Amino acid sequence: MQLAQMLIPMVSAFAITIMFMPLFIGYMRYKKEGQVIREEGPSWHEKKSGTPTMGGLIFIAAIIVSAIWVGIWQHQLTLSVWVSLFILVLYGLLGFYDDFEKLVHHRNEGLKAWQKLAGQILGAIIFLIAYFHEGFDHTLWVPIIGNVSAAWFYVLFVIVWLVGFSNAVNLTDGLDGLVAGQTTISFGTYAIIAAHDGRTDVLIVCLVTIGAMLGFLMFNHKPAQIFMGDLGSLALGGMLAVVAILLHREWSLLLIGIIYVTETASVILQVGSFKLTGKRIFLMSPIHHHFEMKGWSEWQIDLTFWLVGLIGSGIYLAFFL
């Protein structure tokens, strides 16, 4: 795709998002359906209670519609596009049920952990079936060991990657605008990689996601008019992992997704430390809440985390593209 043509997928998803998001916000306000804030979160987040949620429903629709018509236009409606959208939808449905339970029963807990995990693993397995059907390379370089070509090892790795990063993005979604901005950076980086590698089909998926996220950010920046909900964050995290795998740059997520990795690591360290020593490492986890407790504003945290994400992406592009 030429540079001018790359703008079309982004504009399409952006336009659909900004066109329908205000209508959805209005509908959710009319129905008086809003986010239930976790009791263990920062006390000042209570003022966000009642803010419309499930905004992911609109930008997921924008991504799907734009990816399909652009794929048809560019003759790039490949299996890679379909499996990316499949994971987006399936993980989105898991999040939808989670969000729906929270709204209906007015509590901040939806699906049980094992139910969500089972759905995520099922999605990863279906993705793998399509992946192997297409004959994609399943050789994976592993530090110290070297190249591992065993199919069973790659299967386990992909399941961990999809489940891990969908949950990591979900954990990161705790501040206004944070995930919308960070995923724009992440998918933007993969768009550069896809263009470099000649993967126009994956490039289209990245471009429409960038457009949708920029559109959503207009309503999600502080003070947020709407949240994406688990519906949005689980879907984005799952598809982000799929894109990295389709480009056969699996390990790139450790740098390009450094914020998601850090957020998840902070939770693991916090829980582990408390169980082992009875002491907490951070004032609150995930780590973005730690900085809130230190007195940082949401904008300061957003901008700092986005900068770190940009640096991580820049390092990957500079040394590994």
Curated annotation (Swiss-Prot):
It is found in: Cell membrane. Signal peptide: none annotated. The keyword Magnesium applies. It catalyses: UDP-N-acetyl-alpha-D-muramoyl-L-alanyl-gamma-D-glutamyl-L-lysyl-D-alanyl-D-alanine + di-trans,octa-cis-undecaprenyl phosphate = Mur2Ac(oyl-L-Ala-gamma-D-Glu-L-Lys-D-Ala-D-Ala)-di-trans,octa-cis-undecaprenyl diphosphate + UMP. The chain crosses the membrane at residues 6-26, 53-73, 77-97, 121-141, 144-164, 175-195, 200-220, 226-246, 251-271, 301-321. GO terms for cellular component: plasma membrane. Its EC number is 2.7.8.13. Its main location: membrane. Keywords: Cell cycle, Cell division, Cell membrane, Cell shape, Cell wall biogenesis/degradation, Magnesium, Membrane, Metal-binding, Peptidoglycan synthesis, Transferase, Transmembrane, Transmembrane helix. Disulfide bonds: none annotated. Pathway: Cell wall biogenesis; peptidoglycan biosynthesis. Its cofactor is Mg(2+). It is a multi-pass membrane protein. Belongs to the glycosyltransferase 4 family. MraY subfamily. Catalyzes the initial step of the lipid cycle reactions in the biosynthesis of the cell wall peptidoglycan: transfers peptidoglycan precursor phospho-MurNAc-pentapeptide from UDP-MurNAc-pentapeptide onto the lipid carrier undecaprenyl phosphate, yielding undecaprenyl-pyrophosphoryl-MurNAc-pentapeptide, known as lipid I. PANTHER family: PHOSPHO-N-ACETYLMURAMOYL-PENTAPEPTIDE-TRANSFERASE, PHOSPHO-N-ACETYLMURAMOYL-PENTAPEPTIDE-TRANSFERASE HOMOLOG. This is Phospho-N-acetylmuramoyl-pentapeptide-transferase. It comes from Lacticaseibacillus paracasei (strain ATCC 334 / BCRC 17002 / CCUG 31169 / CIP 107868 / KCTC 3260 / NRRL B-441) (Lactobacillus paracasei). The gene is mraY.
